[in-house]
Amino acid sequence: MNGPNANGNVIAGSGGVLLGEGRTNHEGRKALLLVRGDEDTSEYENLVSTMGIHIVEKMIQPGKVNPGSYFGGGRLKLIQETLSIKSGAYKQVSLILLHTNATPRQLVAIDQILGIEVWDRVRLLLALFTSHASSVEARTQVRIAKLLADRTILREAVSVQTTGERAGYGGEGATALQVIISSLNRELTTLRKRLGKHTHSAALRREQRRKQGLNTVGLVGYTNAGKSSLFRALSGKKVLVEDKLFSTLEPTLGQMEKSPRILIADTIGFIDNIPNTALASFKSTFAEALESEIVLHLIDASDSLDEIQRKFMTTKNELNERLTEASFDQTFKTMVVFTKIDRISAKHIAMVRQWIDDEQLHDVHFISSISHQGIDELRHSIFQNLFGSLQSIIVHLSSEGQGQKAVHALYSNGYIVHKREHGEQMFLDIWISESELAKLFHQFPHTIEHK
């Protein structure tokens, strides 16, 4: 090992505590991808591509994973020799990617041999989160997750250097790392207090919305399932919509179009095989979608059936995990929504429908946020689940000047599907909660009535 700074190569997200906040833009970097066995790396490579990183070569080593260094020590030394020549495709390689959630022991061992920056799956995701975090809360959440990941590495590095000291290598490196760990712990304390204030404020806002009679529909699903596109289709609100993994990192709230009493909450997507510790600081982000009356579980219908099954189970398990550890007592109705049906054939839809029958799923919808196919039906189902049946109301417009006030109140508290005027009466079909309608009957006793 080349001294304590060498461990900066395995700190989460390009530098972490040793090099300050580290870089956030990794566009154009060159990397080697190390893989054991015949694992499917397509999703991992998509994550890398989202970062703008170019994989120069995918190196595969058959056999069992080395518990101490992931790849065998001999193979790592050959890679180190190849990189040290700095010629051809390897000339600008500045990053080693591991297709695994590596242990601290493995990461430090690889750093000792290769001496350049090393990311496993968790560190790749944290670097991606860092590049997409724009709000103070999101940056705080990501920083906490990074520091927690960093601390495990630093503790392992201290252990390695302390062992080296006993063998006669000296203890200055271990002492320097212990100082950094102390600094890291102090920063974690500060950040957790800051995040606690954000979390408390967000919880108060949600409670206030509930007291005002607002309903929330949360969007959840695997990353890139089409949540942001559906959010825009339902709310009419312009949001970033990209065909990239984790383009949404922080919660976005919007009012359902033409329905002021319903909010849509879009939040971070789920992904397979990520430790709970990496998501622990995002509890308040998930809460925006989970503290809802309805949760829409989105699935990309254009995926293969195997991928649909895998992503469905990942999201389902993550939802259960988040609810188990959550501090709120919230029950919600779940609706399954298959997205991007404009991209698939009738044959594929038939196969998906058979899968739905096999899984015994209920209240399932097929939509396209691009062509808007199925959006009206989904909206109708949301209203039905929230409000029960469509209400038919008569407004007496000549009722001592209260008619127009009553109409305005109905528009403000519900969703008007159809209206018709006849003489001094207005006939409305409206989606509205029983409690809100009761308030309006009380407020306008001689002006509005059931048809």
Identify the residue ranges that each predicted region occupies:
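N-terminal accessory targeting/assembly segments
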Residues: M1-A127, I448-K451
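C-terminal-of-GTPase-core extension/linker across diverse P-loop GTPases
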Residues: N2-L32, R151-A225, F231-R232, N320-K451
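Conserved C-terminal guanine-recognition region of P-loop GTPase G domains, centered on the G4
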Residues: G20, T41-S49, E81-Y90, N101-E117, ...
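Conserved beta-strand segments of the P-loop GTPase G domain that flank and frequently precede/overlap
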Residues: L33-R36, K58-P62, L97-H99, H297-D300, ...
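Conserved nucleotide-binding/hydrolysis micro-motifs of P-loop NTPases
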Residues: D38-E39, G63-K64, N101-P104, R123-A127, ...
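Flexible beta-alpha connector loops of hexameric P-loop NTPases
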Residues: V65-G68, H132, K238, I268-A278, ...
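Short alpha-helix plus adjacent loop in nuclease-associated cores
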Residues: L124-V142
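Switch I (effector-binding) loop of TRAFAC-class P-loop GTPase G-domains
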Residues: R209-N215, R232-L263, I271-A287
